[in-house]
C-alpha cells in the first residue's frame, strides 16, 4: 500500500550535497539501485524488473547519473524537469502527473522537482515511480564526475564495490 512505503534519505552518494539532500528513495519491488545499507526493500523477489520511487520537495535535484539498465519514470504528483548530458546541458523536458518518460542506458540524466508551492502543498512535494529493467539492477548507478567530487566534499565516498562510506558519520575508508 502507498501509505506503507518506507523511504530512504541516504540512498545515494549525493545525500549530503546541498540541493540534493532532501531526496527520498523507495524500493518497492526488487532492490533497485540504492547504494545505502539503510534502504528498506519492500519486496525483495523481483520478476525481471524493479519498481521504485523518488520523492522530494520543490527545488531538490537528483544529480546527474546513468544506468546500465533501462529506466522509465511515471509521474504521480508534482512537476518535474528532466535534463541530460554529462553536464545536464544537452536537453530537457518538463513532465506533469500522468506523464511517462523512458531514458536510455548509458546517458547521464538528472531531474528536479519544480512544483509550485501553494497552500495545499507548501513544500511542493512531488512523487514519481521508477521502473528499472532486469533482475540485477543493484549497483547500476554511474555518477557524473562532478557529482562524485561534490559528494566527497560533503563526506560521502562511493567505493568500487558500490558501498557508500559516510566519513562525516565516523565511517572510515578501508585500506586497499
Question: How does the language model describe each region?
Answer:
Residues 51, 61, 70, 90, ...:
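A structural connector/turn signal
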Residues 60-63, 81, 98-101, 105-110, ...:
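Histidine-centered metal-chelating micro-motifs
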Residues 58, 68-81, 85-86:
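Glycine- and acidic-residue-biased ligand/ion/polar-headgroup-sensing regions
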Residues 32-39, 50-67:
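Conserved short histidine dyad/triad with adjacent acidic residue
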Residues 1-48, 158-176:
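A short, N-terminal "cap"/entry segment at the start of jelly-roll beta-barrel domains
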Residues 39-44, 62-67, 84, 92-94, ...:
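Short histidine-centered beta-strand/loop micro-motifs
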Residues 74, 86-106:
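Short acidic-glycine-tyrosine-enriched beta hairpin
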Residues 108-176:
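Double-stranded beta-helix
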Amino acid at each position: 500500500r502507498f501509505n506503507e512505503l518506507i523511504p530512504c534519505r541516504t540512498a545515494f552518494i549525493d545525500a549530503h550535497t546541498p540541493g540534493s539532500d532532501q531526496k527520498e528513495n523507495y524500493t518497492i519491488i526488487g532492490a533497485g539501485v540504492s547504494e545505502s545499507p539503510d534502504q528498506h526493500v519492500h519486496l525483495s523477489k523481483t520478476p525481471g524488473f524493479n519498481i521504485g520511487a523518488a520523492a522530494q520537495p520543490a527545488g531538490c535535484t537528483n544529480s546527474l547519473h546513468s544506468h546500465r539498465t533501462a529506466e522509465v519514470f511515471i509521474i504521480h504528483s508534482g512537476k518535474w524537469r528532466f535534463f541530460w548530458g554529462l553536464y545536464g546541458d544537452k536537453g530537457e523536458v518538463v513532465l506533469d502527473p500522468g506523464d511517462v518518460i523512458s531514458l536510455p542506458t548509458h546517458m547521464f540524466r538528472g531531474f528536479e522537482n519544480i512544483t509550485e508551492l501553494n497552500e495545499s502543498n507548501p513544500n511542493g512535494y512531488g512523487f514519481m515511480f521508477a521502473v528499472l529493467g532486469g533482475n540485477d539492477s543493484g549497483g547500476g548507478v554511474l555518477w557524473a564526475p562532478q557529482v562524485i567530487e561534490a559528494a566527497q566534499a560533503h563526506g560521502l565516498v562511493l567505493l568500487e564495490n558500490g558501498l557508500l562510506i559516510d566519513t562525516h558519520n565516523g565511517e572510515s575508508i578501508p585500506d586497499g
